[in-house]
Regions:
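Short, Lys/Arg-rich N-terminal segment immediately upstream of the first membrane anchor
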Residues: 1-7, 346-348
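Short secondary-structure boundary micro-motifs
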Residues: 6-9, 13, 215, 252-253
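Soluble extramembrane regions of membrane proteins in the secretory/endomembrane system
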Residues: 30-347
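Bacterial Sec-dependent signal peptides at the C-terminal "C-region" and cleavage site
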Residues: 21-33
Length: 375
């Protein structure tokens, strides 16, 4: 009798631990890569975030936002991108007054397409691009208790800015292998009403005309695993590419839930037209949009996890000839996916998902029968 109770207790605790781990998005602690690493380095990203998060840079901070925009322009240009600052008309602010805003846009074609001498010259009109997106404005004023506070934008969206620059820097090391190119779009006024992305979509079709995949890098907290929390409709081919990720972490349920929430991201503007993925950390929500979103609270482990997932995905995209078609990622089916600690990512068609659920239910009934009959 004691042995049976021991088995039952042990089984209960194992199930409880697994359930909590899945619910919390548990990922085993990982070592971050140092500044001298040949691969993606969270330490190097943190150097950029230190500059990005020096001061609040919301739509209420015109000078600070301009200084940050110039820094980002310089960094992208320094890496060899054809970089420009795109200004838009002044618009009314929903918190009073008016403000102006500007996007930062940079293009990195494959070698040969930009006159670098690659023997396999590719005409510009035949090249497809991945568009990496983050926003460089921080949250405008927020009331916390009795205080008015401003976010420093270290995670939201310093993570996105720094991670994208590190990804591009790493990808340029194998540029002679590229079959596709990279575009970077750092949008302004995302926190207000996604004004930068809305204006780019409406007024700058050249940014998107040759893009067949969008990756948006966001933050909904400051730490925790980097979650693939949203994909475009018909995501089967997008998820095939995401299968290249190291330490993948995501679940399709979050995409479903997110459709009912009011807080959109830049990805919301384009996801129904261009296939793509949306990433964010979601732990420590109490820091979100407050002055606690500052450099001292960033998580190198979280930053490294973004990079561990996106670095191999980007390399596969850039070097794979099968991704050159404009419709390479347009699928007919939605894939149900989820990640389990240690075991990794599981993906199913909706039909396969129903069969899996039926099999699990049948297994449950069998175990229940054995338990009732013999225990």
């Amino acid at each position: 009798m004691h042995i049976r109770n021991l088995y039952k207790t042990l089984a209960f605790y194992i199930c409880a631990v697994l359930a909590v781990a899945v619910a919390l998005g548990f990922m085993p602690p990982q070592r971050t890569s140092g500044r001298d690493s040949l691969g993606f380095s969270a330490q190097r990203v943190s150097d950029d975030i230190r500059v990005i998060a020096k001061e609040p840079h919301s739509i209420q901070h015109t000078k600070e936002r301009k200084v940050l925009g110039e820094f980002l322009f310089y960094r992208l240009q320094q890496m060899g991108g054809d970089t420009q600052i795109i200004d838009y008309d002044t618009i009314p602010s929903k918190i009073g007054g008016k403000f102006s805003y500007s996007n930062i846009y940079s293009v990195y074609p494959p070698q040969g397409a930009d006159g670098t001498g690659n023997k396999d010259f590719l005409p510009d009109s035949t090249i497809s691009y991945i568009l990496l997106v983050a926003h460089y404005d921080s949250r405008y004023r927020q009331i916390v208790g009795k205080d008015t506070v401003f976010s420093y934008g270290a995670a939201d969206d310093g993570y996105g800015l720094g991670i994208i620059m590190e990804l591009v820097s790493g990808a340029l090391k194998y540029r002679d292998e590229w079959k596709q190119g990279v575009k970077v779009l750092f949008t302004d006024a995302e926190e207000h009403d996604m004004d930068g992305m809305r204006s780019a979509w409406k007024e700058n079709p050249e940014i998107f005309s040759d893009v067949n995949l969008v990756v948006n890098v966001e933050a909904r907290g400051v730490k925790g695993p980097a979650l693939l929390f949203e994909t475009s409709p018909g995501n089967e081919k997008v998820m095939e590419l995401y299968g290249e990720a190291h330490r993948p972490h995501g679940m399709s349920l979050t995409s479903f839930v997110y459709t009912f929430l009011s807080n959109d991201t830049d990805f919301s503007v384009v996801k129904d037209s261009i296939p793509g993925m949306n990433f964010a950390v979601i732990d420590n929500l109490k820091h979100y949009h407050t002055d606690l979103d500052n450099y001292s609270n960033i998580s190198l482990e979280s930053i490294q996890h973004y990079g561990d997932q996106l670095e191999p995905v980007l390399k596969e995209y850039l070097t794979g000839e099968e991704y050159s078609a404009r419709d390479a990622f347009k699928g007919e089916r939605d894939i149900v996916f989820f990640a389990l600690p240690v075991l990794g990512m599981f993906a199913f068609s909706k039909g396969g998902w129903l069969l899996l659920n039926a099999a699990v239910f049948a297994l449950f009934l069998f175990v229940l029968y054995i338990y009732v009959k013999y225990f």
